[in-house]
Amino acid sequence: MAFCAGYFLRKYLAEAKIASAEAQAKKILEEAEKEAEAKKREAILEAKEEVLKLRNDMERENRERRLELQRLERRLVQKEETLDRKVDAIEKKEDALNRKEAEIDAIKAQLNEIYKKQLSELERISGMTSEEAKQALLSDIEKEIQHEAAMLIKEIESKAREEGEKRARDIISLAIQRCAADHVAEATVSVIPLPSDEMKGRIIGREGRNIRAFETLTGIDLIIDDTPEAVILSGFDPIRREVARIALEKLIVDGRIHPARIEEMVEKAQKEVNVQIRDAGEQAVFETGVHGLHPELVTLLGRLKFRTSYGQNVLKHSIEVAHLAGLMASEIGVDIQMAKRAGLLHDIGKAVDHEVEGPHVAIGIDLAKKYREAQEIIHAIAAHHGDEEPKSIIAVLVQAADAISAARPGARRETLEAYIKRLTKLEEIANSFDGVEKSYAIQAGREVRIMVKPEKIDDLGAIRLVREITKKIENELDYPGQIKVVIIRETRVVEYAK
C-alpha cells in the first residue's frame, strides 16, 4: 500500500510539474511572440521613417538642383544678351573702321600725289635727283654722327685716363708709404784699419812677397800708401774684395803673415763669404715671404749682397722691389706671392753678369728657365727694363716697382758733375734737330720735353722726329734706366671780337 501510495504521489507530483512547466513554457512563448510582434512593428515603423526621411532629402536636393539650374539658365541668358550686345558693338566698330580706312586710303593717295609734285618741284629747283639728295643728307648725318662719336670717345678716354692715373698714383703712393727702405752708401773700395804703421811692412813682406801672394790669391789690389794706420783694398769684384777684407783682417789679428798663412786665411775667408752669401739669400727669402726657390737661386740672391748698381745694393734693391710689387698687387687684387717672387728675382742676372757674357736681363731669363721658374716670372724678368713689351699685370708691377726703387731719393748715386753733363747733353741732342724750338730735361734726366715749331713740324713729322731723337740719345748718351721723350706741338690762333 505504501508503495502504491508513493507511486501515485510521485506520479501526481510529476504530472503537476509537467503541467506547471507547460504552462510556464506557454507563457514564455506568448511573451516572446508579443515581444517579436512589438519589435516587428518597431522595425516597420523605423523603416517607414527612414523611407520618409530619404524621400524628404531627395525632394530637397531636387528643389536645390532646380533652383541652381534656374540660376544657371538666368546667367546663361544674361551672357547671351551681353555677347549679342558686344557682337553688335564690334560690327559697328568694324563698319566705322572700314569707313576710316577708306578715308585714310583716300588721304594717302592725295598725299602721295602732293609728295610727287613737291619732289618734282624740288628736283627742278635744286638740280639734284632724290637719290643724290638722299646721299648728301646721309653724308652730312654720317659726318655729324662721326664727330659726336669722336668727341664722346675722347671724353670717355680722358675720364678713363684721369681715373686710371689717379688710381695708379694712389696705389704707388700707398705702396711707397708702407715700404720703409734704407738709403744706401756707395761702396767701391774697402778700407782696413791697422793697429800701427809697422803692420804695413809685415803685410808687404820681404821683397814684397806677401803682398804679391795676397793679390795673386784674392785677385784684389792691395794699396798701401801714406794713409796712417790703414790700407785700401780695390777691385771690381765685390765678392773677391770681401774675401780679401776678411782674410787681411784675420792676418792682422793673427800677426803671422807669410805666403802659406795668407793662402790658409784666404781659404777660410772664402768659406765664410760662402756662408754669408747663403745666409743673405735665405734672409732675403724669409724677409719677403717667398718660398720654394731652388737652392741655387737662393745662393745667387745672396751674391747680390756684394753687387751694387749706381751705388745701390742690388740685394736690398731686389727686396725693396719685391715688397713694392707685393703691396701694389694687394691693392689691385693680383697674386701677391707671384708679384713678390718676380720682384725678388728680377735682377738675379746681376749675380753672375761679371762672369757670364751678355746683359743681366738675358742672363736672368736663362737662370729662371734653368731652375724651372714659372713663365710669368720669366716674362717679368724679361720686361722689367723694356726689352720686351709687358704682357701681364705682374710684369707691369715689377717694372713700376723697379723704377720706384731706383728713382727714390738716395737710392742711387752719381757724381754731380756727371749728372749735370748728362742733362746738358740730353738737351743739346734735342736742340740739334731742325724745327725744335726749345727743350727741357726734367725728372732728374729721366724725361725730356721738346717744344717744336708747328709751322715746320706737322703731326707725322712729330712722330718721325721723336723716333730720331730717341735713336740719337740711345747712340750718344750713357744713362741708367730709360728716358721718356715727349714732343709738344702747339698751334695757337688768336682773334679779337670788337
From Swiss-Prot:
Pfam assignment, any one: RNase_Y_N
One annotated GO molecular function: RNA binding
CDD domains, alphabetized: HDc, KH-I_RNaseY
EC number(s) from the headed UniProt entry: 3.1.-.-
InterPro entries: HD/PDEase_dom, HD_domain, HDIG_dom, KH_dom, KH_dom_type_1, KH_dom_type_1_sf, Ribonuclease_Y, RNase_Y_N
GO CC term (a single one): plasma membrane
GO biological process, one term: mRNA catabolic process
Broad EC category: hydrolase
Alphabetical UniProt keywords: Endonuclease, Hydrolase, Nuclease, RNA-binding
SMART domains: HDc, KH
Start and end residues of each HD domain: 314-407
Record domain KH: where: 188-273
NCBIfam families given in the database record: HDIG (TIGR00277), RNase_Y (TIGR03319)
Recorded family membership: Belongs to the RNase Y family.
Function: Endoribonuclease that initiates mRNA decay.
Stated name of the protein: Ribonuclease Y
Lineage: Bacteria, Bacillati, Bacillota, Clostridia, Eubacteriales
Gene: rny
